[in-house]
């Protein structure tokens, strides 16, 4: 990579305010100014971000430090470190830190970000740890991925005691007919593992509303260890009306172990299958899907009963499906029967 100009200038004003100006039209332009020590700058920033958590233990730094910053980020510098990420023009980050008061404000905006085959348009991310209404706020106008598209994504967060509470809303699907209203939280348990819990939320898919954690209990959560290589899904439960239920639970450990179970209870087939032209599937599903992996050995098992099974309104009867895969998932034994 070739950069035409790169200039960094550090000066002090009459009141001992440090001013660091960076000017490179290919990399980054802007400034940071305030009363801060360069050797403590990393710890100062980490303390500011960590202040969102009330149980964060800050690094020791000198008192009286404060800083404001405003930078315009150009795509070439992003390409150097992350070749698969592309920032749009007029991407900027600005904010200020007052360390002694624990005050941290940040605003990041970009017209678009392309990353690993995914496209995000009109990103606006804000942090204000002293705001009584929200601590973090994120909006994304459009998200395009290879698997699912999203628009009007909004996420807001506030902190209570040692827990971050989030509310997010967005629409998804090929025609954006699916809607999501999710409430969740993040905290740490006594073992210093991350806990991501789902509070009562709802998802509308194919015109049907599913309620997550209808009972508002504390069991709907995922626990992640500090090295991010062990995940425990205690349970995630979705209900439609009073009868239908989908339940997920299991464990994952790096790439060598998985034990996942997906349960269906009186679930209408047409509510969970993707829309396919000229194909209309109906019936009620009961049963489980299991995937067990130990090292490179897999033991997938599926046992499903679909009552009143029909295709394009042609009733076929009650369908029973049993599937067992071999150890490397190269072959599957399928046993099905219609009565």
Stretches with model-predicted labels:
Residues 1-339:
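Interface amphipathic segments
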């Amino acid at each position: 990579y070739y950069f035409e100009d790169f200039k960094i200038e550090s000066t002090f004003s009459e009141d001992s305010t440090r001013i660091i100006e960076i000017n490179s039209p290919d990399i980054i332009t802007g400034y940071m100014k305030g009363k801060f020590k360069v050797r403590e700058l990393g710890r100062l920033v980490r303390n500011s971000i960590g202040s969102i958590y009330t149980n964060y233990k800050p690094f020791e730094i000198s008192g009286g430090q404060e800083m404001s910053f405003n930078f315009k980020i150009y795509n070439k510098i992003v390409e150097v470190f992350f070749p698969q990420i592309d920032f749009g023009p007029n991407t900027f980050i600005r904010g200020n830190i007052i360390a002694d008061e624990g005050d941290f404000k940040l605003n990041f905006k970009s017209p678009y970000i392309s990353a690993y085959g995914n496209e995000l348009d009109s990103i606006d991310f804000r942090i204000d740890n002293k705001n009584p209404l929200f601590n973090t706020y994120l909006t994304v106008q459009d998200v395009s991925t290879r698997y699912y598209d999203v628009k009007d994504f909004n996420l807001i967060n506030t902190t209570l005691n040692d827990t971050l509470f989030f509310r997010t809303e967005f629409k998804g699907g090929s025609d954006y007919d699916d809607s999501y209203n999710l409430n969740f939280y993040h905290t740490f348990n006594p073992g210093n593992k991350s806990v991501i819990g789902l509070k009562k939320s709802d998802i509308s898919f194919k015109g049907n509303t599913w309620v997550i954690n209808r009972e508002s209990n504390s069991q709907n959560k995922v626990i992640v260890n500090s090295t991010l290589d062990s995940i425990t899904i205690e349970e995630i439960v979705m209900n439609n009306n009073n009868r239908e239920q989908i339940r997920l639970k299991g464990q994952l450990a790096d790439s060598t172990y998985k034990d996942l179970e997906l349960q269906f209870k009186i679930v209408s087939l047409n509510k969970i299958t993707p829309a396919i032209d000229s194909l209309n599937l109906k019936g009620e599903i009961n049963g489980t899907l299991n995937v067990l992996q130990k090292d490179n050995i897999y033991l997938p098992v599926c046992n499903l009963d679909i009552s009143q099974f029909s295709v394009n309104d042609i009733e076929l009867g009650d369908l029973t499906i049993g599937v067992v895969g071999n150890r490397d998932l190269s072959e599957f034994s399928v046993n099905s029967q219609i009565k």
